[in-house]
A protein has these predicted regions:
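A conserved active-site cap/scaffold subdomain adjacent to cofactor or substrate pockets
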Residues: 87-114
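An alpha-helical appendage that flanks or caps ligand/catalytic pockets
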Residues: 36-69, 109-197
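Structural preference for beta-strand elements that scaffold enzyme active sites
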Residues: 12-16, 78-80, 98-100, 134-136
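Flexible, glycine-rich active-site loops centered on histidine and acidic residues
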Residues: 1-58, 99, 105-107
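Catalytic alpha/beta core domains of metabolic enzymes, predominantly
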Residues: 5, 43, 80, 87, ...
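Acidic (Asp/Glu)-rich catalytic clusters
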Residues: 6-12, 91-96, 118-130
Length: 197
């Protein structure tokens, strides 16, 4: 589908690829049906295979020897390596890919983000798709006319983060219900990747 989108809109399609399963462990296991399929050891090879299928062939004997993404586009979608760790930052730099840091993860901090970007820049090697490092950050941002209003609106998300860290998956509540919750003070003290103001 990404090859089709790129053929329809050349130079306007980005593809974000990351190691994370995109869900909780139980759901990932149900979808992949094997604990072996959950490992990250094969990720660099899988990434190179995908890059090859989309036209960026850097190694010999990959999936692209047998398969072709169709339609064959004149250009390839830009692949961004998504990550929340130094490993992903270094891999993106090594392959000369754009990097997107997941600051929005609940455990993200400014220092984690800066450290990942420094690793990315230090490991960056120019590639067929990128001459210089290109990094972006994904963050949960909540804004309102005043800081007080933003903090009020952020209450449900803060409580949800606290519940998830405790292994509970609860429905999100209204800002009014969150404001009355005794756990909100603790939720505000958690280190999160949210920017509120």
């Amino acid at each position: 589908q990404f090859a089709m989108l790129e053929a329809l809109h050349p130079g306007r399609i980005d593809v974000g690829i990351g190691r994370a399963p995109g869900t909780d462990g139980q759901t990932a296991m149900a979808l992949r049906r094997s604990a072996d399929a959950l490992g990250a050891e094969d990720f660099p090879r899988q990434l190179l295979d995908l890059m090859g299928l989309l036209g960026d062939i850097r190694t010999e004997h990959g999936l692209w020897d047998r398969f072709r993404a169709t339609p064959v586009a004149v250009t390839s979608p830009m692949i961004f390596l998504l990550g929340s760790s130094g490993y992903s930052a270094e891999l993106a730099g090594h392959l000369g890919l754009p990097f997107s840091f997941a600051h929005h993860f609940d455990l993200g901090s400014r220092d984690d983000t800066l450290r990942a970007f420094a690793l990315y820049r230090n490991r960056f090697r120019p590639s067929p798709v990128l001459d210089a490092p290109f990094a972006i950050v994904s963050a949960n941002v909540l804004v309102a006319p005043t800081v007080e209003e933003a903090e009020f609106e952020a209450g449900p998300g803060r409580l949800l983060a606290l519940a998830r860290r405790s292994g509970r998956f609860e429905p999100i509540v209204s800002p009014e219900v969150a404001a009355a919750d005794p756990g909100l003070a603790m939720a505000r003290s958690l280190r999160t990747g949210r920017l509120v103001g």
